[in-house]
Amino acid sequence: MAAEEYRWMGKPLKIGELEAEVPIIQGGMGVGISRSSLAGAVAKEGGVGIISTAQIGYDEDGFEEDQAGCNRLAIRRHLARAKEIACGNGLIGVNIMVALKHYKEHVKEAVAAGADVIISGAGLPMNLPELVGETCRTKIAPIVSSKRATQLILKMWDHHYKRTADFIVIEGPKAGGHLGFSDEQLKDVGAIDFDGEVQQIIACKRAYEEKFEREIPVIVAGGIYDGTDIRHALELGADGVQIASRFVATKECDASEAYKQAYIQAKDEDIEIIKSPVGMPGRALRNAFLERIKGSKQSILKCYNCLEKCNPAKVPYCITKALIDAVKGDVKNGLVFCGANTGRIHEMTTVHQLMQELIAETAV
């Protein structure tokens, strides 16, 4: 007898004229963790699949000699493949880090390749509207962590480009990867009133909704694990959620099997806050690599020119090499970013099973 199939019975996620039946965005994870396989599978289930463009072409022929060219090629290739996998369902987009040296090129490539949405963080995407152009159908969203950052970006876009965000991703302190909080704040995550911040941001964006006569959906991210978390976010007034870490332990995730197993085997005490060459704190799994960089600066034999502001002579390690080593399977000597709830992940699943589980739990 076939298992019961669950359908999302709540409101869909509407971003302008675009619509995703299930208001779940799969967060972008780089290097190489969320590419076409994962993003396409999430969209196929009615959600929003997000491809990370950070060194996306790491496994393309000629990458060592021409990273920029291989990354542009891979953006096109993976967006096209994700759309094929999705079979017309959901939405497909990209996550592009502001800190990237070739940020502008990645944005333009994603637009040309037909990305439905661009989500941009690791810095505030001040000039994103200019890069996508006025007539572009691709929807854009900044990642923010505070009311202050939200006010700044919305005011900037309004003043300089006479437009506003198509949606906003609010990322909390329990997220993985790079975090928009200080080291001091991250020492006591419980002291941060994130719910209050979300409500303030929702109130803040209403003036821009009125001015531009359009809705600006709000997506809550960071530590979203199950249906209880999704329900809570929606009750706060959010229009959807972004989930990343839970999708790592799926068969469709683009990472190596060793990377997925590192998540499954992780315990709460294995997770720590680190300093990234990007200039922001990050959350990652403790391993031999992190222990080494605490003691001394790692020699950088090759610069990949991946970050806009990076001095190889001063940074403690090469983030590109560390992330590529990890995604390929060397999880002891690479950098494994993760969310605060990774210790709750204990088994492998599929995107379909996970989405079904989340939908069923949210409906309870």
Model regions: which residues?
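Residue-level detector of intrinsically disordered, flexible termini
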Residues: M1-A2, D325
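Active-site entrance/lid segments in N-terminal catalytic domains of soluble metabolic enzymes
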Residues: A2-Y208
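Conserved active-site-proximal phosphate/metal-binding subdomains
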Residues: I25, A175-I219, Y225-V364
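Residue-level detector of alpha-helix initiation sites
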Residues: I33, I224-Y225
